[in-house]
Amino acid sequence: VFINAKCRGSPECLPKCKQAIGKAAGKCMNGKCKCYP
């Protein structure tokens, strides 16, 4: 699931995903965070 968070690298998305979906799993795609439920 894509969240409305910009990123330059996948590690930036982990805390954002944890905040958004409660799980620190995801990666940076095309400058946006994609989180895995």
Swiss-Prot record:
Location(s) in or outside the cell: Secreted
Pfam families the record matches: Toxin_2
MF terms in GO: ion channel inhibitor activity; potassium channel regulator activity; toxin activity
Site (Aromatic residue of the functional dyad): 36
Expression sites (tissue/organ): Expressed by the venom gland.
GO cellular component, as recorded: extracellular region
Disulfide bonds: 7-28, 13-33, 17-35
UniProt cross-references to InterPro entries, sorted A to Z: Scorpion_toxin-like_sf, Scorpion_toxinS_K_inh
Lineage top rank: taxon: Eukaryota
Record key words, sorted: Disulfide bond, Ion channel impairing toxin, Neurotoxin, Potassium channel impairing toxin, Secreted, Toxin, Voltage-gated potassium channel impairing toxin
Residues of the site described as Basic residue of the functional dyad: 27
Biological function: Blocks potassium channels Kv1.2/KCNA2 and Kv1.3/KCNA3 with high affinity (K(d)=1.9 nM and 10.7 nM, respectively). The voltage-dependent steady-state parameters of potassium channel gating are unaffected by the toxin in both channels, but due to the fast association and dissociation kinetics the toxin slows the rate of inactivation of Kv1.3/KCNA3 channels.
Other comment: Negative results: has no effects on Kv1.1/KCNA1, Kv1.4/KCNA4, Kv1.5/KCNA5, Kv11.1/KCNH2, KCa3.1/KCNN4, BK/KCNMA1, and Nav1.5/KCNA5 (when tested at 10 nM).
Entry domain remark: Has the structural arrangement of an alpha-helix connected to antiparallel beta-sheets by disulfide bonds (CS-alpha/beta).
Family: Belongs to the short scorpion toxin superfamily. Potassium channel inhibitor family. Alpha-KTx 04 subfamily.
Name under which the protein is recorded: Potassium channel toxin alpha-KTx 4.6
Species this protein is from: Tityus stigmurus
Taxonomic path: Eukaryota, Metazoa, Ecdysozoa, Arthropoda, Chelicerata
